[in-house]
Amino acid sequence: MKKMSKHIVLSFAVSSLLFSQAYALPQGGKFTHGTSGTIHTSGNTVTITGKGQNHVIQWGGGFNIGQNESVNFTTSGKNYLNIAYQKDASKIDGALNGGNNNIFLVNPMGVLIGKTGTITAGKFVASTTPLNDENVKTFLKQGASFSPAFDVSKQGNIINLGKINADNIVLIGNKVEIKKGKITLDVLKLEGNKVYVDAGVVKDTKNIVAKAEQEVIIQQSITSFEENGALLGNSSSKFSFDDSSKVKNWTKYGSIADATEWNKFADFLECK
């Protein structure tokens, strides 16, 4: 009996591992709402080619990209609305190669871009706001200019730890966090109940627009502080806030990570 139980446990563990590996790429994708195209999966790569200008893809098995895996949008200058159906946040640990296409990813449970995750696109939008048919029709009319409305009641978070390279980025969720990684773009729009930004991550951004219902925090390491000419939250000079008077808590602070940064901080105090 003991040997059998061990075999059952081992079999379950192996099957669970195989199941998780099998679903590390987007699953169950179908073009809907009158749009069309092809979705081809080969090994660790999904290739998507739309046949029109605006496309809607509903992913019945969720939208995730595992480490060392990739999703490639092969067209140029097109718009793709990806709607993920899953019980947890979409995890981007691999490569989302959008080229100069505009990529929208909607998952009410959230979107997590991991440390190994990379995204390239003309415009990238991640949102936790559920979309109804009227919203989708609006996307089909507006294309790249479409932006989901913020729903304060949804608890899904948008968190970035990876690298995003796009001309325009829009992140909408309960809590929007840009904690690590690198973001290179012209315009960054953040909207949520709470917005947390590491200023060092967005230092190359030309324009940042934030809207928060409850709290805004801009954090900056001492190293980044030094690189930005001893200006705390140098990127904050690029921030503009919608309805900023409604924000209950507004904070800017510098952080010290190790002994090297302590020394830099001490040198700064001596100079003062």
Regions found by a protein language model. Give the residues of each.
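Gram-negative bacterial Sec-dependent N-terminal signal peptides
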Residues: 1-23
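N-terminal leader/targeting signatures
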Residues: 8, 15, 221, 235-237, ...
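Short, intrinsically disordered, low-complexity terminal segments
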Residues: 10, 19-21, 227, 254-256, ...
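Solvent-exposed adhesion/ligand-recognition segments of exported proteins
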Residues: 21-243
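Aromatic (phenylalanine/tyrosine) cluster motif
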Residues: 225, 239-241, 253, 265-268
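Short, low-complexity, Pro/Ser/Thr/Gly-rich segments in the mature regions of secreted, periplasmic
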Residues: 257-271
